[in-house]
Design a protein with these regions (language model features):
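Rossmann-fold dehydrogenase core element
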Residues: 73, 88-105, 119-128
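Short glycine-/small-residue-rich Rossmann-like dinucleotide-binding loops
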Residues: 55-56, 79, 180-182
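Short hydrophobic/aromatic-enriched beta-strand-loop microsegments
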Residues: 26-28, 71-78, 97-100
């Protein structure tokens, strides 16, 4: 598998490191403004089977154009897209396979599956989503928190509430509280709290290093490389991992 890494910040470097450890061939690195690596996708001449993108939303048009022009699958793990940009990704997926997720860890894929099963059983519980990240993360709530919120909304009629300081009223049952913590060097922690009368249930995922996201991105690349055009997500990653586990058993 020949991989092009698009965006060579902290995550791009870790993807390269993990790829080499797994024996995956990194044939190109594109890092805008870099003197060390290729600056734009249009300059890439090396063979590429799949692109792993940890860049920023401003580079999305060039990324989608590159994938379509060269018929190359894309793993898009960049965060902070607008609804319009997500729509552009969905449109492009009609021509090429695209995996898009704000979080590429298998643990989050598993957490989403658990929510699909648990949320319909908790109609008498109030649900809150709490996420914590390092002090340098600029977007809040995190894309993963939003992903979890969408999973909850798919199973219950709730409305996300992002702040309560201006509200002077009791919490409504249909609210979905969203909370962000920023500090230190926290890689990423996401908790879904189900608060009932006299008891609480918590589902929690903690990333212990950024390697978990690199592993997931490479697994996603392997998952979609031979798939038909379409939009793929964490559910596909979970299904593939489950299939492999069952084969081993």
């Amino acid at each position: 598998m020949n991989v092009l890494i698009h965006g060579f910040g902290a995550m791009g470097r870790i993807v390269e490191e993990v790829a080499h450890a797994q024996g995956v061939n990194v044939t190109a690195i594109v890092s805008p403004g870099s003197d060390e690596h290729t600056a734009t996708l249009s300059e890439v001449e090396a063979p590429v089977d799949v692109v792993i993108d940890f860049s920023n939303p401003a580079l999305l048009p060039a990324l989608l154009a590159f994938g379509r022009e060269r018929n190359i699958p894309l793993v898009i793990a960049t965060t902070g897209f607008t609804p319009e940009e997500l729509a552009e990704i969905e449109t492009a997926s009609q021509d090429i396979p695209i995996f898009q997720s704000y979080n590429t860890s298998y643990g989050i894929a598993l957490l989403k599956q658990l929510l699909d099963q648990l949320v319909p059983l908790t109609l008498g519980y109030d649900i809150e989503v709490i996420e914590a990240h390092h002090r340098k993360k600029v977007d809040a709530p995190s894309g993963t928190a939003e992903l979890l919120a969408r999973a909850i909304e798919a199973k219950r009629d709730v409305t996300p509430i992002y702040e309560r300081t201006s509200r002077r009223e009791a919490r409504a049952t249909e609210e979905l509280g969203m909370h962000s913590i920023r500090g230190g060097t926290i890689f990423g922690e996401h908790t879904v709290l189900f608060a009932g009368d006299d008891e609480m249930i918590e589902l929690k995922h903690t990333a212990l290093s950024k390697r978990v996201f690199a592993n997931g991105a490479l697994a996603a690349a392997a998952t979609i490389i031979d798939r038909p055009a379409g939009l793929y997500n964490l559910s596909n990653l979970y299904e593939e991992a489950t299939h492999v586990t069952h084969k081993r058993l």
